[in-house]
UniProtKB/Swiss-Prot annotation:
It comes from Aspergillus terreus (strain NIH 2624 / FGSC A1156). This is Transcriptional regulator ATEG_03638. It holds the Pfam family Myb_DNA-binding. The keyword DNA damage does not apply. SMART domains: SANT (SM00717). GO terms for molecular function: RNA polymerase II cis-regulatory region sequence-specific DNA binding; RNA polymerase III type 3 promoter sequence-specific DNA binding.
Length: 166
């Protein structure tokens, strides 16, 4: 009987490093005592590219708990940024826009689900594309002079109040 593979393991090495293995491949390193921010540049984890076809459920909150200064979103973005070979980073195509529109219509703003339906973009990319370009509820036309005068009549304190009133 084949056992299910644990998608991630976090361990501590003898030399004071936190090592995160995703699907059996070391992909994140962090010195435990380091006060410097945790940064992973290009080429830091070349081996994690080989796991791009692996499926599984990962608790990004749990992984981040072992990496001081990193959030669950940092870890998720690092993973997808280095392993998701099918992720487009250039301009959106008409087909992607159509898939995004249908996915939002069906799933709402559950961006992880929407991104899985779109298939070629990350959740953050889908959210930004929808909110900044495609959402039909947002008026993307140039501001009228009346709108500019109205918007400029508020102080920053008014905006804070309005944001909390919604």
């Amino acid at each position: 009987m084949e056992s299910a593979m644990t998608p991630y393991v976090v361990g501590f090495s003898l030399d004071g490093l936190v090592i995160c293995y995703l699907f059996g491949v070391p992909c994140m390193l962090q010195e435990v005592a380091s006060a410097a921010p945790f940064r992973l540049g290009p080429g830091t984890c070349e081996t994690d590219r080989s796991t791009s076809q692996t499926q599984g459920s990962v608790s990004w909150h749990e992984i981040a708990s072992f990496l001081p200064g990193r959030t669950n979103k940092d870890c998720r973005k690092r993973w997808y940024g280095t392993t998701a070979t099918k992720v487009n980073k250039g301009p959106w195509t008409e087909e992607e826009d159509e898939r995004l529109g249908k996915a939002v219509q069906h799933h709402g703003t559950k961006w992880a689900v929407v991104a899985s339906v779109v298939g070629t973009r990350l959740p953050d990319q889908c959210s930004k594309r929808w909110m900044h370009a495609l959402n039909p509820e947002i008026d993307h036309s140039p501001w009228t002079p009346e709108e500019v005068v109205f918007a400029c009549s508020f102080s920053p304190k008014d905006f804070v109040f309005l944001m909390h009133a919604c």
